[in-house]
Amino acid sequence: MKGLKGLLVLALGFTGLQVFGQQNPDIKIEKLKDNLYVYTTYNTFKGTKYAANAVYMVTDKGIVVIDSPWGEDKFKSFTDEIYKKHGKKVIMNIATHSHDDRAGGLEYFGKLGAKTYSTKMTDSILAKENKPRAKYTFDNNKSFKVGKTEFQVYYPGKGHTADNVVVWFPKDKVLVGGCIVKSGDSKDLGFIGEAYVNDWTQSIHNIQQKFPDVQYVVAGHDDWKDQTSIQHTLDLISEYQQKQKASN
């Protein structure tokens, strides 16, 4: 896709990213754009340690957090750290799908007084699983404006899960891909227990068509600085499908 192909060269620009010293070694925060930060948290899944990436935006009204730290033990450390740095509180939290590395902080942020959001589809899944839910829900696509900051939540279709959405920050041309976008160093599609692999390719193409001028893509796990993630995701899907076909 024009605008996403060749984004590897942009990775050179990441060498100047500012990394903040955190008290919790399982939390890392890096400045991506003027008021947009990537936060990475670490947790163990089936005996292997993984990194989960998401972002927060500092606005004139307060801080908007997309997704949540991966693991309850990191919630307070995370909010303490960003308050210490910015002197502002979290006023909004949006979960990009129902898994714990995305929706796990809804209850915590809600108790802090933040407005919490998810799609109705995510809310339905959380309800069935008896997990904490967002206070506010919306249909698959929604535009937000917080102070002077505008961003958009977009549902591209099924992929990693039925309910996965992405978040677009138009001013910064940053796409928060969540778990539907695999990192450039991913060896496979990861957890696919709730995936719709046959729909995944079209959903990625929908993202490409919707946001043709992306400059930075933040993949949901592992190395988000490798800007080949969109194409690599398509390659991984194709590889998986070929293996499945060969085994049948």
Swiss-Prot record:
Pfam families: Lactamase_B. Zn(2+) 2 binds at D101, C179, H221. CDD domains: BlaB-like_MBL-B1. PROSITE patterns: BETA_LACTAMASE_B_1, BETA_LACTAMASE_B_2. GO terms for molecular function: beta-lactamase activity; zinc ion binding. GO terms for cellular component: periplasmic space. Zn(2+) 1 binds at H97, H99, H160. Its EC number is 3.5.2.6. InterPro entries: Beta-lactamase_class-B_CS (IPR001018), Metallo-B-lactamas (IPR001279), NDM-1-like (IPR050855), RibonucZ/Hydroxyglut_hydro (IPR036866). It is found in: Periplasm. It catalyses: a beta-lactam + H2O = a substituted beta-amino acid. Keywords: Antibiotic resistance, Hydrolase, Metal-binding, Periplasm, Signal, Zinc. Residues 1-21 form the signal peptide. Its cofactor is Zn(2+). Binds 2 Zn(2+) ions per subunit. Substrate binds at K182. Monomer. Confers resistance to the different beta-lactams antibiotics (penicillin, cephalosporin and carbapenem) via the hydrolysis of the beta-lactam ring. Belongs to the metallo-beta-lactamase superfamily. Class-B beta-lactamase family. This is Metallo-beta-lactamase type 2. It comes from Elizabethkingia meningoseptica (Chryseobacterium meningosepticum).
